[in-house]
């Protein structure tokens, strides 16, 4: 089932080969500590298995957006507490998000001059992605329990800065991904499972 949707998701990720980009909104460096966003879980209530492919795709896109938004909140708050992501992700997608949070919290950051700068990162901007196609397939005896969302991810408006203010080196800001979202029968909820870089610009 094909869908077209432009989604804005504030996220951060380390410059990892898997994710191919990073993203989040940053706290205002001139603002007080009270202005820094507090991470909040956007996980919904328990839901039954999908009744159709359309329903599965809609649920998968919703949790994917929540996942990216929560990553942004976690990292904008300093990356020290990635626990809100556990309600939205599992497997490799959770590992990527936790590693991104650690990157933000601890550094070092490789800057555009290819110098590693110690200390935590700060970020600004947000990542956009556009769904190209999406489809469901069986997962652990649940019809349409696995949704693959093929998308163009655009991180051109997102920037990461090292602790000295220099901009971080980053890969191609526009690249193709297959996002995989699963229905977890035990938890009765949708979880982002994998972020697969296809290695192509878009």
Where are the language model's segments positioned?
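Bacterial N-terminal signal peptides that target proteins for export
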Residues: 1-10
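Solvent-exposed, flexible loop/coil residues
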Residues: 5, 78, 162
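C-terminal motif of bacterial Sec signal peptides marking the signal peptidase cleavage site
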Residues: 17-20
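Bacterial signal peptide processing site
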Residues: 22-25
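Extracellular mucin-like PTS domains
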Residues: 30-46
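Core segments of small alpha/beta cavity-forming domains
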Residues: 44-120
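Structured, amphipathic secondary-structure segments that form assembly/contact surfaces
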Residues: 87-178, 182-202
